Amino acid sequence: MNDGVLPQNNEDASVEATLHPVGISFSKSSIAAFAEEGISEIGIYVYMDGSLIYGEKQPLVHGAIEVPLPLGENLQTFVVANADEVADADQLSTAVIRQNDNMQKPVYISEIIGFTSDNSVKSLDVELKRLVGQAVFAPVESQEEMDGIIQFDALDITFTNVGVAYSVKEEKAVLEDVTVRTNRESDFGAYVYSFPTENNGSRTSVDVAYLKEGVIVNRTNGSLDTGIIFKSSKRSVVHMEILNEDWVETEWESMIEEIDF
């Protein structure tokens, strides 16, 4: 993969002179979102005839960045923030954004922008929008009920059909199941971000495994069909009675053993 250095021709010293600095500035809403999420750098990817000529992460300085580009060319670019990886970026047609954090943080991306790098283009105004949607698992029990739970001390929440990677060109997600472990400290709640799944024709369900001291002691008696389709900047909340015995394979009462002591 090109690390952001333009191709050089050692036999032609004039190549460097043909580079044209193009500024990239961001909207106030984008800068505000970056500050809120603690984002301090962004990735810029520029393509000529579909092939990468510049791909680099840059620190944000006053919300503007300057990129050296070849003069007089028709180019395409996209900008991404808070992504763990942009894989297969050598070609625009194969560039895929991936997350490696169990989908626990949002990703921001611009549209693919076409422009000509002539002297009249001093700067590109870029707006990054939150690409991901979010699903939240929220138990409905009261705090008093939470405090009285002795049957388990953690939950593994599995969200099915989560968009864990995203094709920039095709605007389509790669789907996998994602499991998030939660416990009493977070009131047994959990969440996951997902790239949009509208173009995948799939819906998300939830499976819950109940654990005590790291061992599964119960689980839901089937996937809970939530009907969730992930959409950019949309949050869906799944409310569940985690103590309701109608939802689990084994009644909690039957798991309690009384012995003399």
Task: Show which residues each predicted segment covers.
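Bacterial Sec-dependent N-terminal signal peptides
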Residues: 1-26, 30, 137, 233, ...
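Beta-strand secondary-structure signal
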Residues: 16, 21-23, 43, 78, ...
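Ser/Thr- and Asn-enriched, surface-exposed coil loops between beta-strands
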Residues: 18, 61-63, 118-120
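Tryptophan-paired
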Residues: 31-91, 146-232, 254-261
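Structured interaction patches on ligand/partner-binding surfaces of diverse proteins
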Residues: 84-123, 214-245
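Conserved "repeat-terminator" motif of extracellular CCP/Sushi domains
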Residues: 125-132, 192-197
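Surface-exposed interaction/gating patches
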Residues: 127-148
